[in-house]
């Protein structure tokens, strides 16, 4: 059984055409992307020449920005329409990004033989999985696969939403209904993930947390910022336990 939720895929299929419209359904991601790109590059000690896997890449906003910083990017997703948008936009942007419609579990299976033949160098220096864990039935499986695809000294990044009343008020009521930053029904509160749950799954996968930050939005300025408050949206970086 594939680790996908068809209803979740359908949501993003419907929104695919507006993926690269900075004023469309994905406006918050366009606004957030420079901040998260900077965080990823800082935590990973730069992206130039590094092999990067973007899990749940969607229409390619993060994938393209990492490629522009010199990363060798592979993006995987199970939504066909967003991937078509991603491929077209990368072509128009003159970027080579390997986009594949595949689950991470299947991708890992395909890569395992390559690792056995060519060694650890075929693994990834950086893996990103942003705003994706809260949209799948089994987040722990995604995390375990990411670990197996990572080089020994690589860095993994996860971002998701805390399961708190504050997150419900800000992300669902505020962003979807009041500010209309996101289409209604984009998020399901029951699928939000507490930091303790993320840390537990990562520990099971033998990953250790390097850093965890919350990111916050000011609707008056349209700007995001980072701090240590992880009561709503947050992201974290991990390495393989030594």
Swiss-Prot record:
Protein name in the entry: Ubiquinone biosynthesis O-methyltransferase
Residues given in the record as S-adenosyl-L-methionine binding sites: 36, 56, 77, 130
Family of this protein: Belongs to the methyltransferase superfamily. UbiG/COQ3 family.
UniProt xrefs under PANTHER family: METHYLTRANSFERASE, UBIQUINONE BIOSYNTHESIS O-METHYLTRANSFERASE, MITOCHONDRIAL
Any Pfam family matching the protein: Methyltransf_23
Keywords: Methyltransferase, S-adenosyl-L-methionine, Transferase, Ubiquinone biosynthesis
Catalytic activity: a 3-demethylubiquinol + S-adenosyl-L-methionine = a ubiquinol + S-adenosyl-L-homocysteine + H(+); a 3-(all-trans-polyprenyl)benzene-1,2-diol + S-adenosyl-L-methionine = a 2-methoxy-6-(all-trans-polyprenyl)phenol + S-adenosyl-L-homocysteine + H(+)
Phylogenetic placement of the source organism: Bacteria, Pseudomonadati, Pseudomonadota, Gammaproteobacteria, Pasteurellales
GO biological process, alphabetically ordered: methylation
GO molecular function, one term: polyprenyldihydroxybenzoate methyltransferase activity
Pathway info: Cofactor biosynthesis; ubiquinone biosynthesis
Function (record text): O-methyltransferase that catalyzes the 2 O-methylation steps in the ubiquinone biosynthetic pathway.
EC numbers on record: 2.1.1.222, 2.1.1.64
UniProt gene name: ubiG
Organism annotation: Pasteurella multocida (strain Pm70)
InterPro entries: SAM-dependent_MTases_sf (IPR029063), UbiG_MeTrfase (IPR010233)
């Amino acid at each position: 059984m594939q680790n996908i939720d068809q209803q979740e895929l359908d949501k993003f299929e419907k929104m695919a055409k507006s993926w690269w419209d900075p004023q469309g359904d994905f406006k918050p991601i366009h606004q957030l992307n420079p901040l998260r790109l900077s965080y990823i590059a800082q935590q990973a000690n730069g992206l130039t020449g590094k092999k990067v896997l973007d899990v749940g890449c969607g229409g390619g906003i993060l994938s393209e920005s990492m490629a522009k910083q010199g990363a060798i990017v592979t993006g995987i997703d199970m939504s066909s329409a967003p991937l078509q948008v991603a491929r077209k936009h990368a072509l128009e942007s003159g970027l080579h990004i390997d986009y594949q419609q595949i689950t991470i579990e299947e991708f890992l299976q395909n890569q395992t033989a390559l690792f056995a033949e060519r060694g650890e160098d075929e693994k990834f220096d950086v893996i990103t999985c942003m705003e994706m864990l809260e949209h799948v039935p089994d987040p722990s499986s995604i995390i375990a696969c990411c670990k197996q695809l990572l080089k020994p000294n690589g860095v993994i990044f996860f971002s998701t939403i805390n399961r708190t009343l504050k997150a419900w008020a800000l992300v669902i009521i505020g962003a979807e209904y009041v500010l209309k930053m996101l289409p209604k029904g984009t998020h399901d509160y029951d699928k939000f993930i507490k930091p303790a749950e993320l840390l537990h799954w990562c520990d099971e996968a033998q990953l250790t947390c390097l850093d965890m930050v919350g990111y916050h939005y000011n609707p008056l300025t349209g700007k995001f910022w980072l701090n240590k408050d992880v009561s709503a949206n947050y992201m974290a970086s991990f390495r393989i336990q030594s």
